[in-house]
Design a protein with these regions (language model features):
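Hydrophobic transmembrane alpha-helices and their immediate loop junctions
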Residues: 1-148
Length: 148
């Protein structure tokens, strides 16, 4: 049950993060494709594996949400596209915390919203690490290219 709960809390954070990359890239006129992770060449295979492991009550799960590839864009636009995903997580984090802080939702939802907010905080911070392979690197690299 804990794994199912975790998946329900995490899925919107991952999906909205990737869709933000896609739609922002498209807004700059790029062709953008959301790639779901495959497993042994099976499209969406990683998702199928996660669902299977959840139903088998497997104690340890890993998950790769996917990634977006897009056609070439100017450096600043690429930086903005890279920031779109983490920005979505930042908005979900601060939005969730605000719902609780200002009592805008029923108290019975505080735990779920708090978990969602903390997960999005983690996704935001983790994705903004300025190392290759992370969105933070692409944000930083795009800004350096655009302004230096």
């Amino acid at each position: 049950e804990d794994i199912k709960y975790g998946a329900i809390i995490a899925a919107p954070a991952v999906v909205l993060h990737e869709l933000a990359h896609k739609f922002v890239a498209m807004s700059f006129g790029a062709n953008a494709v959301l790639h779901a992770p495959s497993l042994f060449g099976i499209p969406y295979g990683m998702y199928l594996l996660v669902i299977l492991l959840i139903h088998l009550n497997f104690p340890i799960l890993f998950f790769v949400g996917g990634y977006v590839s897009h056609t070439a864009l100017p450096a600043l636009a690429s930086s903005i596209v890279a920031f779109a995903g983490p920005l979505t997580n930042l908005i979900l984090w601060l939005g969730g915390m605000s719902l609780i802080k200002y009592g805008l939702v029923n108290r019975k939802y505080y735990t779920n919203i708090g978990m969602m907010a903390k997960l999005n905080m983690f996704f935001f911070i983790f994705n903004m690490i300025p190392l290759p392979g992370f969105d933070g690197f692409n944000v930083f690299f795009g800004l350096v290219q655009a302004f230096l």
